[in-house]
Amino acid sequence: MISIKGLSYSYFERQALEDVSLEVQAGEFLGLIGPNGSGKSTLLKCLCGILPPRRGEILLEGKPLKDYSRRGVAQRVAMVPQDSTFGLNFTAYEVVLLGRTPYLERMQLERTSDHEAVQKAMERTDCWDLKERRIWEISGGERQRVVIARALAQAPRVLLLDEPTAHLDIAHQAEVYELLGSLNRQEGLTILAVSHDLNLASEYCTRLALMEKGRIKAVGGKKDILVPGLLNEVYKQEVFVQASPVTGEPHVFLVPKRK
């Protein structure tokens, strides 16, 4: 689905990505983990065409990403940023309708098929009942479901999410990841999600990529990546890892630096 080969990107003098290579298979749920500033968000921005890589190549379905038009990329890859800003008077329906922009010509009005796609996306994310509510008056968890619905309205093959549960309480965190897991399992949607919550990533992702200082440190199964030695080295923090008594997936616990 996605092949990243020797990708590098820099913000002026600061190297954000350095020689990143990664294969993402169709239908997998890949979690991107790593410390702040390790390049996770920059990698997502390169994958959706927002940032052009300085070196290296990204292949989407076997074709160089740079050979797609902006519309072509948007019809295949949807991005859910960490923070989304909308006009205060937008309804939830109007926000999701923005996801149909890649399929419309300039000044073209939305067609019946576009409205059908919006309803389907909102029903899939269980936010159809919010369609007439203003985006500013709904809760954080509800707003995140609306933003994900907007991405799904693009009918993408790949969904990218940058910390989709940031600023949410544990109930809404679980709600968002249950939704993503369902989209991945039942519909085969390929998902790449940046997460600072290692335990949520462990429970819902099928594979993990650990980043450090702009590079891919390790890629593999959750039980191969979420191990004390590797996490201690990358995060510079002692951790304890134990299988969840409920699911058996590895869970990471902070070891306090108490004297």
Regions found by a protein language model. Give the residues of each.
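Helix-to-loop junction immediately C-terminal to a conserved catalytic motif
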Residues: C48
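Conserved ABC ATPase signature
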Residues: R134-I138, E142
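Conserved ABC transporter NBD signature motif
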Residues: G56-P64, V73
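The feature captures the beta-strand-to-loop junction immediately N-terminal to the Walker
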Residues: I33-P35
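Conserved catalytic motifs of ABC-family nucleotide-binding domains
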Residues: A155
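Conserved ABC ATPase "signature" region
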Residues: L97, T112-L130
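Catalytic Walker B motif of ABC-type/P-loop ATPase nucleotide-binding domains
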Residues: L159-E163
